[in-house]
Amino acid sequence: MDAVKKPFIAAVSGIKNSGKTTFLEKLVKEITERNYKVAVIKHDGHEFQPDREGTDTYRMQHAGAYGTCIFSRGQWQMLKKEPGMDVERLAQFFPEADFILVEGMKNSLYPKFEMIRGSVSKESVCIPETILALVTDTEQKLPGIPVLGLDEIKKAADILEKLAETNKKTGEI
């Protein structure tokens, strides 16, 4: 019996304005160009406004619906007010993905690239054992952890590819 394929989950983490979104956008582009299917889950440490005022789904939410969903022939989007959501539960919506990349989650146990930009941060804020590489424009170093420049996207993708391949063989991260 074949093992069920499970997406490899990794994060891009760091403090606010450290360049997570820009790095992640480039990393997604690089990985998809390597013919992998990628999903992204963004963690927001604050409550966010998911819809625009005036849309039908916005109106239904404000009328009291605890959940709304919109779909067309090729895509769908759902909003459900539910406390306690986490990456593992959301990942179930992307079973066909090769990679699920999470933006944020600096205190999680997911393997991660930690962003450190000198203009906004000077030191690591993530659990050292979870860091795949520091991505930085500073001299910051941590023992045994590779350091990448802010634009070393191909090297970051190589790290992910290698780790995902190892994970496939061993079943572990």
Roles of regions detected by a PLM:
Residues 1-7:
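Phosphate-binding P-loop
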Residues 79-107:
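Phosphate-binding/switch loop-helix module in NTP-utilizing enzymes
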